[in-house]
Amino acid sequence: MTDLKKAAQRAIELMDLTTLNDDDTDQKVIDLCHKAVTPAGNTAAICIYPRFIPIARKTLDELGAEDIQIATVTNFPHGNDDIAIAVLETRAAVAYGADEVDVVFPYRALMEGNETVGYELVKACKEACGEVLLKVIIESGVLADPVLIRRASELSIEAGADFIKTSTGKVPVNATLEAAEIMLTVISEKNTKVGFKPAGGVRDAAQAAEFLGVAERILGADWVSPRTFRFGASSLLNSLLHTLELADAPKRTQGY
């Protein structure tokens, strides 16, 4: 197997296959669950809006794919600074049966100089999650400044995040190698049990390999696993399956 095919295989096993569109329906989520069961193995998770968790759970059970985790989003996509609402949304997501919650850090508050609200919001949402995995989306493409990307990562980890994630996929700049370098370096300094999720903008096996390479250089080859590394993506899967000669070439899309 070529290096590119190896990267494609790994990226599928590390993928949060995502649909977070305003026009999502039960049927689209059912279709997503079927796509997550690929000829190259199951994706690590699917990521959907909270209201679709019950139908996703039913579908995955019917497919015998109980190993696929169900992730959802809260405080999404704008990263508001109302802690009470973020906590209520997170509690509701857990009650729906989410295995993982991706919460948006109040990044605009941080840009305005308020570090406290981000820390407190993540801390409260982690308490609401209990054993459910909490991924914190820092929206690195909007923060832009390396100092802010680093600080959002530090605050999230200090507050109890299980993962730090680059992006919502709802802004012009999503996952970049530069942001990955900063975020993975913070993980190496503060807590190597914390995971990293580049989301949006990873289009093919070659790009996936670049992100995996940064993680391995900073944290070691043994660090990367579904417990510590995920790709958030929708259009990436077809490209990876094409690389593995298991699907036709994907049509060019503007997808996440």
Swiss-Prot record:
One cellular component term from this protein's GO annotations in UniProt: cytoplasm
Annotated signal sequence range: none
This protein's record includes keyword Ribonucleoprotein: no
Enzyme superclass (EC): lyase
Pfam families: DeoC (PF01791)
Compartment(s) where it occurs, according to its Swiss-Prot or TrEMBL record: Cytoplasm
GO annotation (BP), single: 2-deoxyribose 1-phosphate catabolic process
Active-site positions on this chain: 102, 165, 197
Stretches of the chain forming a coiled coil according to its record: none
Biochemical pathway: Carbohydrate degradation; 2-deoxy-D-ribose 1-phosphate degradation; D-glyceraldehyde 3-phosphate and acetaldehyde from 2-deoxy-alpha-D-ribose 1-phosphate: step 2/2
EC number: 4.1.2.4
Catalytic activity entry: 2-deoxy-D-ribose 5-phosphate = D-glyceraldehyde 3-phosphate + acetaldehyde
GO-annotated molecular function: deoxyribose-phosphate aldolase activity
SUPFAM superfamilies: Aldolase
Keyword annotations from UniProtKB, A to Z: Cytoplasm, Lyase, Schiff base
NCBIfam families: deoC
Chain's role: Catalyzes a reversible aldol reaction between acetaldehyde and D-glyceraldehyde 3-phosphate to generate 2-deoxy-D-ribose 5-phosphate.
Family designation: Belongs to the DeoC/FbaB aldolase family. DeoC type 2 subfamily.
Protein name: Deoxyribose-phosphate aldolase
Species per Swiss-Prot/TrEMBL record: Shewanella oneidensis (strain ATCC 700550 / JCM 31522 / CIP 106686 / LMG 19005 / NCIMB 14063 / MR-1)
